[in-house]
Amino acid sequence: MPQSQRPLYIPYAGPSLLETPLLNKGSAFSKEERGSFNLTGLLPPRFESIDEQAERAFRQYSCFQTNINKHIYLRAIHDNNETLFFKLVQNNLAEMMPIIYTPTVGDACEQFSDIYRSSRGLFISYEDRFNIDDMLRNATKNKVKVIVVTDGERILGLGDQGIGGMGIPIGKLSLYTACGGISPAHTLPVMLDVGTNNQKLLDDPMYMGARHKRIDQDSYDEFLELFISAVKRRWPNVLLQFEDFAQPNAMPLLQRYKDRICCFNDDIQGTASVTVGTLLAACRSKGSKLSELNVAFVGAGSAGCGIAEQIISQMMNEGLGAEQARSQVFMVDRFGLLTQGMGELRDFQQKLVQSNEAIAEWDIAGEFASLVEVMHGAKPDILIGVSGQAGLFTEKVITAMKSHCEMPIIFPLSNPSRQVEATPSQVINWTQGQVIIATGSPFDPIEYQGKTFPIAQCNNSYIFPGVGLAVVAANISRITDGMLQVASETLAAASPLANGESDELLPPLTSIAQLSRDIAFAIAKVAYKQGLALELTDDELLAKIEHNFWKPEYRQYRRTSL
């Protein structure tokens, strides 16, 4: 009997059952269940299916005029009836993904203390650092398989949001379930509250987080060690995703813990994987290889450098040597092109500097090459923005790029949409429509000279749900670069544009559940070859993936005593 058809034995009854979001069915409780669970009279008399409930919920949702109010409404359903919430989201994924995650989740993080209704997940403050084991035991979910954790310091392109950063793990895990089939019973959002340096929040009487500046680095490192160790004791096989940690901590945390626990940083590795997958699709659509092209970045933080390193790995997979691959990648930060001799660079940036000899023939006015000078000197075929600064891709920059590249690939990826380096409309106009474009935030299609340009959203949700599904289905113990590379390849293989099926660079969101299955399968195969997963035949692996792919369906309940 399929798991969804097996009855669940439930110890709760009456209001306690209705107040348990993972179990509440609302008006869908049958007559027999209402009698068995002391629900008679607590609900309207009509029995409804989940489809009828979802139709009513969508009508209510549609009455809200602003995205933030739609977000608040969906969170209310999430906190009341998780099965209905995910049914509603899956039925309307393209409409609701920008509401439950980027860009609207950015507004929700900024307004967290103002719109707070009820608790979800764990809030672990530095002051409680010696009680973390007890706090993890307080979690209402015993079989946690995926944790998303943040410290709220670098939320999207919005900076330090303190405790408001909790909106990101909640939203991210919603997509693990909606897109990757991870059961909501197995997910846990965690906020590590180490204070905030956002004075506006500290001065806000409604702010719900710890009212002090962020703790010093030694205290921070001690706190993270206590947290990771406690998680390993409680759930030794969990997948831990680091989310929206600031640059000074993001890469060091990943390097410190990647061999101690199954973990990854979505801002670094997930962003890199989806970007490389989208680039591969773009390259194939124009009949070229990534290794044949030059790439320029605006933004040399942990995310940008993470993408660059995966691009270099892909170029090497295509036959280039490491030195040649690195010579084709140009990183621009706020001071200019990363170059030998530039001061105050982090270790991960040092590996991506250009030699002084390589740019000796360039026409450079200042100490370091500007973005426009990089366009003329490097002649990049690809331009990627991960700066978090709006407007950096000016008309002068784009026209300089277009002067040497017939069909440039331009990805302004910064989130939220108000932080984007250039809008799709601007890029299309400045290139006379001769461009392949993808963005980090959702944008409507652009009409230009009688042609419609669909705008691909280079969204990490194409990748991380499949990573989670692979870990859960195949008991993967570590995440490796090879797994993320095969995820990129799987995404590229699904590109309608590269396959000549349509003008869409990335597959539609309606197919993301199947894409997550395909990515999970590919990752699990690599994991087994690397000795990091179960040994399974292809048929066994497919069955495992399907068995673990949760669907928002009500199950029959039977009562048991506590």
Swiss-Prot record:
Residues annotated as binding a divalent metal cation are E243, D244, D267
- What keywords are annotated for this sequence in UniProt? Metal-binding, NAD, Oxidoreductase
Question: What's the top EC group for this one?
Answer: oxidoreductase
The GO terms this record gives for MF are:
malate dehydrogenase (decarboxylating) (NAD+) activity; metal ion binding; NAD binding; oxaloacetate decarboxylase activity
Cofactor(s) this protein cannot do without: Mg(2+); Mn(2+)
Q: Which GO terms describe its cellular component?
A: cytosol
InterPro entries per UniProt: Aminoacid_DH-like_N_sf (IPR046346), Malic_enzyme_CS (IPR015884), Malic_N_dom (IPR012301), Malic_N_dom_sf (IPR037062), Malic_NAD-bd (IPR012302), Malic_OxRdtase (IPR001891), NAD(P)-bd_dom_sf (IPR036291), NAD_malic_enz_proteobac (IPR023667)
Report residues binding NAD(+).
Answer: R154, D267, N415
- Site label Important for activity, positions: D267
Q: Which reaction does it catalyse?
A: (S)-malate + NAD(+) = pyruvate + CO2 + NADH; oxaloacetate + H(+) = pyruvate + CO2
Enzyme Commission (EC) number: 1.1.1.38
Q: Where is the active site?
A: Y101 (proton donor), K172 (proton acceptor)
The record's remark on the cofactor is:
Divalent metal cations. Prefers magnesium or manganese.
A biological-process GO annotation: malate metabolic process
Family statement: Belongs to the malic enzymes family.
Q: How does it assemble?
A: Homotetramer.
Output the PANTHER family linked to this UniProt entry: MALIC ENZYME-RELATED, NAD-DEPENDENT MALIC ENZYME, MITOCHONDRIAL
Q: What is this protein called?
A: NAD-dependent malic enzyme
Organism of origin is Colwellia psychrerythraea (strain 34H / ATCC BAA-681) (Vibrio psychroerythus)
* Higher taxonomy: Bacteria, Pseudomonadati, Pseudomonadota, Gammaproteobacteria, Alteromonadales
